[in-house]
Amino acid sequence: DEAIFNDIQAYNDENHYQKPYTIKEVNGRQIAIIGQAFPYTPIANPARLVPNLTFGIREQELQTTLDKVKVKHKPDLVVVLSHNGIDVDKKLASRVNGIDIILGGHTHDAVPNVIEVKNNSGVTLVANSGCNGKFVSMMDIKFSGKSYTYKYNLIPILSSQIVPNKDMERYINKISDPYKADLSEIVGYASETLYRRSNFNGTFDDLLCDSMNNVLNTQLSLSPGFRWGATILPNQSIRMEDIYNHTAITYPNTYVREMSGETIKNILEDVADNIFNVDPYLQQGGDMVRTRGIKYSINPKQTINNRISNLRLNNDLAIKPNKMYKVSGWASVNNIEEGRPIWEIATEYLKTIERYKVDNTKNIDVIGEKDNIGIDI
């Protein structure tokens, strides 16, 4: 997720880049809406792309803003639009008083029911709508004096059943028409479902990793645990638009470098801690880094430096801490890479093999989560 602020002037009041809230009147009721940006933007993305901006989970600043809004505008309802993620939202709701509703989507988890979080001022309703326009959250509020009741529905969006808005359709066509030839080019075919969202892997990520290992001639590859990108069905053609749909970021360049076995393990441990840390405020988003060419075991309930074990190459030879291995990857956060963009690598690979078939060999052993129905590898 990237911050884009084209042609927006700095908002100077109390050092905010933009006004942190707005007031909307809905059916005669004053609704205060406060925005919460993704707190780890300069960590999960290159900090150089958001210079002079700061981000974070600032409970006291939010509480101060909320208190001022209540005094100045006396809203009937306070809503926070959040890019935090469901776990962070739940913790925030328990520690900041006066928020009625938090509507979020960062974790991309479609949560079917509202989560009621208790705090010192009462209860905050926390909802999460998923991603990619698959769902719309609808919350009906019925006021009775200063109190209210609510009804919540998570509505699935079936695009085939929706008539497009004509103005928006014309606008999209106007923007995309110059690129249609490139976007519609068929570069390969999928033998099975290519998707992104699993905790530890995704078959489209397997495609990207296999592309790097083959085109860049590396032993193993790393791909970020991004959560976005539309699924491709079995026997469906893979177009350039599909490749861009999973890779279109402003730092797409690939890299090849030698890494020690110790460095490889440290990378896996660091990413795992960002995901599985017991403190939601230390979870920085995304799913586990995707890998090809290696096998490992992971215990999410362990602490940092103790989650990853039994790290091996695909031929079952142990990865040794002091031995060097040839590694490829893309979307480097800390370095400006000079390699070709990942979409060029994936396209070259697909044009060579024509049809991509996923190797379903189990390379990741998840320990201690046998009864967790949310784990899918």
What name fits each language-model region?
Residues V50, I57, G130-I377:
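Catalytic centers of hydrolytic enzymes
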